[in-house]
Structures are given as C-alpha cells and as structure tokens.
Amino acid sequence: MPEKLFLTEQEVTFAEEKPILQRYEPGRINNQTIARIASNFHYCWEDEKIFALADKLRENESVMALGVVDRKGTVVGIIVRKDFFNTMVRPYARDVFRNHPVKEIMQETDRYDVNMNLFSVSEEISEDMRRPGVTYYVLTNEEGRFRGIFSTQDMLLYLSQITQSDIALARKLQSRIVRERDFVVGREFEFVASSRTAKGVGGDYYEIRQFEENL
C-alpha cells in the first residue's frame, strides 16, 4: 500500500482540533492515598512542539506543572511552568526551540503510585519539604500511566490542615476537662476560678476540692 503523502480535509480538521494541553479526570479517590492531595491533572504528548505548548500555557495560567507522556500514555517526564518559561525567555530560545518537541525540554522527577499511602509518601519527601521552593512529583498507575501531579506545597498544606484540626480537637477536649470558669458557693464563702490557656491549648489547670463541710 503506497504511503499517504497528504491528509484529507477531515484529518486536517481533527488534527487542528486535538488539544495540545490535555487533562486527566480522576475518579473516586481513597482519602488515605496520595491521590487526595494531587493538584495538577494536565499533560501533553512528548512530541508536541515546544512553542505550541508555550502558547497553551499562557492561556492557562493556573497550570503550574504538567506531565509528559508518550503515545502509549506512559509518563516520560514533567514540565514545571516556572522552569519552562525561564528557558523560553533566554536569548535565541525561539530560534533554538522553534520546531523541537517537548521531550527535549522536559525534566525528570520522582514518580509515585497513585494508590500509595499519603503519610508514607510524606516521610519519603520530608527532606524536599525542608528545602526552599516547590518540588513536583508525578502520580502513575500500575502501568505507568499519568494520574496527576502533587507538590511539596500540597503536602505541607495538607499536613498543616491536620495540625489545625488536631489543635481544635485538643481545645475542645480541654474545655470539657478544665472549664474556663467555675465556682463554688458555701454558706459563708464563694470561690471563683478562671483559666485561659495560651492559644487555647496548654497544660495549666486549676482544681477545686472541698475537704470539710465548712471549708
């Protein structure tokens, strides 16, 4: 069968309408898995042109990072918006990268199974969370297919929310044990106590105990 040299009008239309910037739509998520904190779900093919992708990213300012996949859908790298545009503004970048594919400018990054336990991952990236800046990671399924992106910032925000929830719970429990105000009224006396702990949670307490009927 001879090789087809030209696309039909229908094929050209399909090629023009096919989005460069694509998005994975996550299904039901287990709250204990790392998928819970994924914040970016966009990806592109590794053979897309660099400047075509740059135009799409300018139109979608909320995309901070995206996965790069081959035509089988397997993850091969990542594009981080900040680093990508820092490269694009270099002298002669337009001439150098005009017709080059995205795979020539993508970055390598750590990959995690989308079903991995969230807290296990937090332990693995603990060193990265201590460093300045934001580090991005790719989520994949068992076949290596793209399933999203999360970052050290996403993890820190989630852990911060847990901390705030724990503090709120501790404050509620403490208020039940040590009331903010209490009083005892006897025939010849009144005893009033008040306690307000630092930031709503603390170790200070008071105790009222009657030893004898008239004391």
Q: Which role fits each region the language model picked out?
A:
Residues 9-40, 80-134, 151-181:
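Tandem CBS (Bateman) regulatory domains
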Residues 162-215:
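… and, occasionally, acidic/histidine-rich disordered N-termini of signaling adaptors
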Residues 71-72, 142-143, 212:
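Residue-level recognition of short loop/turn positions
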Residues 135-141, 147-151:
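Amphipathic alpha-helical protein-interaction segments
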Residues 75-78, 145-146:
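Glycine-rich acetyl-CoA-binding "A-motif" of GNAT/NAT acetyltransferases
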Residues 1-14, 60:
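Terminal presequence/propeptide segments associated with secretion/organelle targeting
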Residues 43-63, 69-70, 112-134, 140:
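The conserved cystathionine-beta-synthase
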